[in-house]
């Protein structure tokens, strides 16, 4: 019986296979009257509304990248979308083409490893998405139908914006097919539903039947060049964005978790094309913000690595490796890039500047740099300052697009960003064309020796705190904030002032947190002690309260409603298990020369609780802060009961605090202080 079932199964498989073979037409049957062929790397056939793509026989086994972008529509210009990515073209049988997406989480990077063959046999890759072959060309290229993937599918490219509603596929059409040196691009006009009220007063919207408007999208199929994988392994000391994988060739007994960096192939210059619709007043600052990175590339041995050009009418944005655009819909500066999942090579990138990009940036600059830059005091919207901020933002985004992690570029108030030594070292590590390396492991060892020689001592330490100066500068601005906002005497109901006032108080809170983060860090003991003194000077006992008199007198905003949540975060950091554990560890490892937990509590009591001096006057705000500190302390003990050693240290110190408060609750001359300390004691119980 089982033998009979087996025979039936084989017959069914054969029947299915034969039917698949029969579905493949001859080229003469396929190439109907009126069909048009567009020659190129990937020939394209068009008949009425159907679009077919030919995969030449020699490209089977090659890799392609399928990506897309929104060209225009919904007030968007050249915005990247999620693409299919890098796939390998496979042909498992005569009737099928597959786009395989191998997984690279497990690898053997050593091409000469004796385990290569066994690894490849055991590490079977998925077949990927399959596409029926419609016909074969006279050159034996496989022809597949791709209409639905362009018109209404989400497989090759997709986008998700709340203001773009459902697709109306029956109205969508392919409007342009453009072969280029590396592949072919398809421009599609899709129609989406729209919330009519949103566009009632928008000159950019044309309301079409059934409430839909067009969205122009381009999908690019790019044949990736055949070349040796240019992998550069990461080192934790140099901040790059990375891909993590498990390597079986570094240790004969187990896998080793490793990572490689994301970077461009700089064998030819990377040209950033700027959209022709980009405002000319900003072109130069964007150009300078990009080209400033050439300083780092020159030190890495690469000249004219980055270039900037205006895109002319012949340039199709979606086909370019790097493109910069300006549109109206989404304020702010955003960047995105695609990369090869095996090699980490960055393949394309986009920089999008949305109208209103300066929103918030000028206010941030006023609060942080206004005390030293009179231009922003004279005019909150100074064009010169706006351009400098844009250039700085672009420089930071380009660093991200080059594969770097974090912002390594440096600037000070009133200046544009310069590429510092940290950034130059990072570019050298990622892009210097090393010679004489046998493989990626040898290359990394060579770079590690270079790092050991060139990375200065103390790189891992936090820089000296300048938050004290920042708090002082913020105080200067806050004192005159109403005069700056209402320059010329024109005043509203307070909304303009209230918005920036809230931001100022939150910034004050962030500065206090920055000071607090020094405690428990790798900074020297003197720096950590100084941080506690600064908290005393700028929070516990400030000479001048961080306040705007106009806001307070006109009851526009309650300062403490904004500040106190920030203080909760600060105390939860200072009293966290991580911070206290780090302080205890410092005391053990430094022969009592480090900043210990005893030192921390001594400084905390001296500042916040006046060293328990009964003659010291205590303000209502100081009592509020004491209560916030105690509540954070109790929360941490409750949330971390499992951390026995450090939690016990916190509990013991809390009992010590209780005994001191108990004494003050009976002898302090201020009745309200006695009442408060009685309340605190009740909470501790």
Task: Identify the residue ranges that each predicted region occupies.
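The catalytic-center signature of Zn2+-dependent metalloproteases
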Residues: 24-25, 310-333, 388-435
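Hydrophobic h-region of N-terminal signal peptides that target proteins for export
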Residues: 11-19
């Amino acid at each position: 019986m089982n033998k009979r079932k087996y025979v039936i199964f084989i017959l069914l498989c054969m029947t299915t296979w034969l039917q698949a073979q029969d579905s493949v037409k001859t080229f003469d049957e396929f190439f109907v009257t009126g069909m048009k062929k567009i020659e190129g790397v990937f020939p394209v056939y068009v008949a009425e509304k159907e679009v077919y793509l030919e995969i030449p026989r020699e490209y089977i086994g090659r890799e392609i990248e399928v990506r897309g972008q929104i060209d225009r529509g919904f007030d968007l210009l050249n915005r990247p979308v999620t693409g299919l990515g890098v796939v390998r073209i496979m042909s498992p049988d005569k009737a099928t083409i597959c786009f395989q997406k191998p997984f690279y989480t497990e690898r053997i990077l050593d091409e000469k490893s004796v385990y290569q063959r066994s690894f490849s046999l055991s590490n079977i890759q998925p077949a990927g998405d399959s596409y029926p072959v419609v016909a074969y060309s006279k050159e034996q290229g496989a022809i597949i139908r791709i209409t639905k993937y362009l018109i209404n599918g989400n497989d090759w490219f997709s986008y998700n914006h709340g203001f773009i509603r459902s697709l109306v596929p029956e109205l969508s059409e392919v409007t342009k097919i453009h072969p280029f040196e590396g592949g072919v691009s398809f421009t599609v006009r899709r129609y989406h539903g729209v919330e009519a009220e949103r566009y009632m007063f928008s000159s950019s919207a044309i309301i079409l039947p059934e409430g839909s408007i067009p969205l122009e999208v381009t999908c690019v199929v790019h044949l990736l060049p055949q070349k040796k994988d240019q992998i550069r392994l990461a080192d934790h000391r140099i901040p790059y964005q990375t891909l993590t994988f498990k390597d079986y060739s570094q240790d004969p007994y187990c896998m080793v978790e490793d990572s490689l960096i994301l970077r461009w192939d700089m064998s030819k210059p990377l040209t950033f094309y700027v959209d022709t619709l980009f405002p000319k007043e900003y072109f130069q600052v964007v150009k300078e913000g990009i080209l400033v990175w050439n300083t780092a590339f020159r030190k890495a041995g690469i000249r004219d690595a980055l270039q900037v050009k205006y895109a002319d009418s012949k340039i199709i944005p979606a086909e370019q490796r790097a493109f910069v655009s300006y549109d109206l819909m989404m304020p702010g500066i955003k960047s995105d890039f695609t990369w090869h999942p095996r090699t980490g090579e960055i393949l394309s990138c986009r920089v999008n500047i949305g109208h209103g990009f300066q929103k918030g940036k000028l206010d941030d600059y006023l609060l942080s740099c206004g005390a030293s830059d009179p231009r922003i005091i004279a005019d909150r919207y100074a064009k010169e300052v706006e351009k400098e901020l844009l250039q700085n933002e672009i420089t930071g985004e380009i660093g991200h697009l080059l594969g770097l992690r974090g912002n390594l570029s440096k600037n000070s108030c009133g200046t544009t960003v310069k590429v510092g030594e940290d950034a130059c070292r990072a570019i050298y590590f990622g892009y210097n064309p090393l010679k004489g390396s046998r493989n990626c492991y040898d290359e990394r060892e060579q770079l590690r020796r270079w790092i050991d020689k060139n990375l200065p001592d103390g790189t891992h330490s936090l820089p000296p705190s300048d938050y004290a100066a920042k708090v002082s500068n913020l105080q200067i601005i806050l004192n005159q904030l109403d005069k700056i906002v209402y320059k010329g005497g024109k005043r509203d109901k307070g909304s303009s002032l209230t918005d920036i006032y809230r931001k100022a108080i939150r910034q004050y809170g962030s500065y206090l947190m920055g000071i607090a983060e020094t405690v428990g860090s790798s900074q020297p003991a003197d720096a950590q002690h100084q941080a506690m003194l600064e908290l005393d000077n700028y929070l516990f006992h400030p000479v001048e309260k961080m306040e705007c008199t106009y806001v307070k007198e006109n009851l526009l905003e309650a300062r403490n409603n904004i500040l106190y949540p920030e203080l909760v975060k600060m105390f939860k950091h200072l009293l966290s298990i991580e911070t206290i554990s780090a302080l205890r560890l410092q005391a053990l490892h430094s022969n009592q020369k480090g900043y210990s937990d005893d030192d921390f509590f001594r400084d905390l009591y001296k500042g916040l609780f006046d060293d328990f001096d009964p003659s010291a006057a205590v303000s209502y705000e100081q009592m509020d802060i004491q209560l916030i500190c105690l509540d954070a302390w109790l929360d941490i003990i409750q949330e971390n009961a499992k951390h026995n050693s450090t939690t016990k240290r916190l509990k013991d110190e809390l009992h010590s605090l209780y005994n001191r408060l108990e004494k003050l609750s009976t002898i302090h001359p201020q009745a309200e202080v006695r009442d408060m300390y009685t309340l605190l004691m009740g909470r501790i119980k």
